[in-house]
Amino acid sequence: MAEPGFFNAMLIGALIFGYVLGSIPFGLILARLAGLGDVRAIGSGNIGATNVLRTGNKKLAAATLILDALKGTAAALIAAHFGQNAAIAAGFGAFIGHLFPVWIGFKGGKGVATYLGVLIGLAWAGALVFAAAWIVTALLTRYSSLSALVASLVVPIALYSRGNQALAALFAIMTVIVFIKHRANISRLLNGTESKIGAKG
């Protein structure tokens, strides 16, 4: 049996590994490589896929979405070789890294894509629940932000109902953070001024 000190060091190492991986600002990097400048200077100023889409480059936005998700998936799957606790630590680290990336002044995205990526890595069936909730909400309301909020809210409930308390607790914490990062969106939703899917600007 591993010593407690080694176990704790392993978890800290997994957390740091996940954070560094999650901190890679793919939206910013891809936009610059495509000659679109600093994505933080347009729209919401966010580095995520939704704001990259405001450049008008759908392929670039899709690439950003995929890469931001893969950060979470890769962190969780690689760390899983050292056990579920390490995978959870690395996944959470990747999520936090995306939100607060050290490379660009700790001002990152809102975490939805990386949330989904971590979910794929830790509980792929939960990712199907997320996708279903997102699609249904989007079809009914046309609000991307609301769809993400509803989907993230459903996930920990679904995980808990399946008896996976550890993952349910992790994603409950991540969901709270997602809601906090979407404060402005929630305010606009309540005021009826939130942009709908397909709207420009």
Swiss-Prot record:
Its main location: membrane. It comes from the Bacteria. Pathway: Lipid metabolism; phospholipid metabolism. The chain crosses the membrane at residues 10-30, 60-80, 86-106, 116-136, 139-159, 166-186. Pfam families: G3P_acyltransf (PF02660). It is a multi-pass membrane protein. GO terms for biological process: phospholipid biosynthetic process. One of its GO terms (cellular component) is plasma membrane. The keyword Transmembrane applies. It is found in: Cell inner membrane. GO terms for molecular function: acyl-phosphate glycerol-3-phosphate acyltransferase activity. Its EC number is 2.3.1.275. Keywords: Cell inner membrane, Cell membrane, Lipid biosynthesis, Lipid metabolism, Membrane, Phospholipid biosynthesis, Phospholipid metabolism, Transferase, Transmembrane, Transmembrane helix. It catalyses: an acyl phosphate + sn-glycerol 3-phosphate = a 1-acyl-sn-glycero-3-phosphate + phosphate. The keyword Transcription regulation does not apply. Probably interacts with PlsX. HAMAP family: PlsY. Catalyzes the transfer of an acyl group from acyl-phosphate (acyl-PO(4)) to glycerol-3-phosphate (G3P) to form lysophosphatidic acid (LPA). This enzyme utilizes acyl-phosphate as fatty acyl donor, but not acyl-CoA or acyl-ACP. Belongs to the PlsY family. This is Glycerol-3-phosphate acyltransferase. The gene is plsY.
